[in-house]
């Protein structure tokens, strides 16, 4: 059982940020990424609206996103976003079932940013370096 826990943790340790090729920079500091994903920054420099795509919090990658980026539990993250949306401060993220769905959403929406557990680029997306690294 201990071995399985380590294996599952190793699979979700590395997260990758992808963006649509229209609007987003090719590199971000982790602090800037966190600001974007907290809804504090709403537009890219070119004026495109930032749209956030995340893995559902009941997935291993989604749980890792909650901990590594937001420093929250999945329930805390849901409450955080409900409050922001209710107060009209930000549009909430789109929560998707798989890395493939996140990649498709990001590819189809200029200004979109997504976090997945896979280092893969598809048409109209690119991997954003976070503090100079492809994965964190």
Residue ranges and their predicted role:
Residues 1-7:
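C-terminal segment of classical bacterial N-terminal signal peptides
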Residues 10-136:
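Flexible loop/hinge segments at secondary-structure junctions
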């Amino acid at each position: 059982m201990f071995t399985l826990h380590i294996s599952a943790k190793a699979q979700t340790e590395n997260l990758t940020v992808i963006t649509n090729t229209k609007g987003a920079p090719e590199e971000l500091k982790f602090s800037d990424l966190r600001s974007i994903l907290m809804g504090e920054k709403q537009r890219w420099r070119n004026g495109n609206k930032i749209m956030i795509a995340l893995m559902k919090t009941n997935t291993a990658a989604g749980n890792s996103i909650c901990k590594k980026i937001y420093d929250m539990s999945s329930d805390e993250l849901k409450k955080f976003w409900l409050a922001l949306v209710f107060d009209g401060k930000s549009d909430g993220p789109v929560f998707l079932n798989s890395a493939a769905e996140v990649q498709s959403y990001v590819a189809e929406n200029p200004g979109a940013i997504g976090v997945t557990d896979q280092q893969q680029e598809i048409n109209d997306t690119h991997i954003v370096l976070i503090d100079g690294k492809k994965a964190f």
